[in-house]
């Protein structure tokens, strides 16, 4: 039997703005406080480890470390947020963080 090429570590989208951006437009830039161990194809989910809902299969790519919210400006249009200040305020545990490009995978 052929093994799935989906990575083990799911990526969670519990904040509506980036989740809706991803599902409506097929792409979202997301900033996470902790650097992910895995990138590549994985499952996007909503919820937590005990109870979650599968949203889609996605491809996660690391962009780089972000120190200040102003550095998010080039990615704002595809973040789901209106301002970098709003986006920065939603990053769990705040900045610095790690920026990822997440696309729906075919």
Identify the function of each model-found stretch.
Residues 2-106:
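Structured alpha/beta reader/binder surfaces that contact nucleic acids or chromatin modification marks
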